[in-house]
Amino acid sequence: MWYCYILRNKLPQFKNNTYNGSTNNPMRRLRQHNEEIKGGARATHGKGGAWEICTMLSGFPNHINALSCEWRMKCPSGKPGKREGKYQGVRGRVSSLNGILPLERWTGKCIVDNMDFNLKLHILSDVVQYLDLTCVPEHITIEIVDVIDSSCVELDKEMYSFEE
């Protein structure tokens, strides 16, 4: 299973810093972003290791669809380049989902329509206010949680080492 996620930094000096990505192992990837293990993104490096997942969309049928969703989260307008100011920060990143989630396809590279599979959106209780729940299509289940951790993740435990 593949996941798309939005991270936020919990440190006051980096409170407006966000990052989004895709992975097949969110907890390992979070540890990388927090510099506990090798492999985090350049954008999250040197920011105090205080990243947390504030939204996580799961259920992608393949890596292509997950990467297409990741790109659309980075470019909510559908055009490459710098994100508009209204899509920056935690509020902007989460509110951009209002326009992204209802799309039939994230990009032209998607090989199936989004309505053809079920997705689940885990979202933190303190950011759900930025999501217009009326925009969320029926094939996406919403779970409002206080923390997004390993209990929100479904992994093939034989394929991945699963450490917290």
Please provide the spans of the model-predicted regions.
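GIY-YIG nuclease catalytic motif and its immediate N-terminal context
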Residues: 1-69, 97-164
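Short arginine-rich
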Residues: 34, 39-45, 71-91
